[in-house]
Swiss-Prot record:
SUPFAM superfamilies: Thioesterase/thiol ester dehydrase-isomerase. The lineage of its organism: Bacteria, Pseudomonadati, Pseudomonadota, Gammaproteobacteria, Enterobacterales. Homotetramer. Dimer of dimers. Interacts specifically with the aryl carrier protein (ArCP) domain of EntB. This is Proofreading thioesterase EntH. The gene is entH. NCBIfam families: PRK10254.1 (NF007607), unchar_dom_1 (TIGR00369). One of its GO terms (biological process) is enterobactin biosynthetic process. InterPro entries: HotDog_dom_sf, PAAI_dom, Thioesterase_EntH, Thioestr_dom.
Length: 137
C-alpha cells in the first residue's frame, strides 16, 4: 500500500460534507493499494445545457480524486494543492453514473502527478485527466 495516511472510505466521504464535492454527488467508492476511485451521477447537477455530462464536472471529479490521493501521500503538517489539470474528453455521457479511477504517475517529495480516467457504466473510457500537485509544508 502506498498511502501514508490511513483513512477509511467513510472518513474520506465525510471530508466532502458541505462542499462542491457533495453538491455534485461525488462519492469515494474504492481505496486500494495504489488506487482511489469515486462515482459521480450524470444528472441535472452535472449536465451541460445540451443534456450531456459537462466537461467541467469530469474535471471536478478528476481534481477531487487526485487531490485526495495526493493528500493521502502526505505526512502530518503537509498538504497538497493542484498546479495543473489536463482533461481529454473521449465520448459523451448523458445519464447514469461515471466512475473515476486515480493512480499515481509520479510521487516526489515536492510534487506529484496523477492519472485519472473516467469511465461510463459500460466501462468505456470517457475522459482521461492528468493532475499535477505541489506538496506544501
Amino acid at each position: 500500500m502506498i498511502w501514508k495516511r490511513h483513512l477509511t472510505l467513510d472518513e474520506l466521504n465525510a471530508t466532502s460534507d458541505n462542499t462542491m464535492v457533495a453538491h455534485l454527488g461525488i462519492v469515494y467508492t474504492l481505496l486500494g493499494d495504489d488506487v482511489l476511485e469515486a462515482e459521480m451521477p450524470v444528472d441535472t447537477r452535472t449536465h451541460q445545457p445540451f443534456g450531456l455530462l459537462h466537461g467541467g464536472a469530469s474535471a471536478a471529479l478528476a481534481e477531487t480524486l487526485g487531490s485526495m490521493a495526493g493528500f493521502m501521500m502526505t505526512r502530518d503538517g503537509q498538504c497538497v494543492v493542484g498546479t495543473e489539470l489536463n482533461a481529454t474528453h473521449h465520448r459523451p455521457v448523458s445519464e447514469g453514473k461515471v466512475r473515476g479511477v486515480c493512480q499515481p504517475l509520479h510521487l516526489g517529495r515536492q510534487n506529484q502527478s496523477w492519472e485519472i480516467v473516467v469511465f461510463d457504466e459500460q466501462g468505456r473510457r470517457c475522459c482521461t485527466c492528468r493532475l499535477g500537485t505541489a506538496v506544501l509544508g
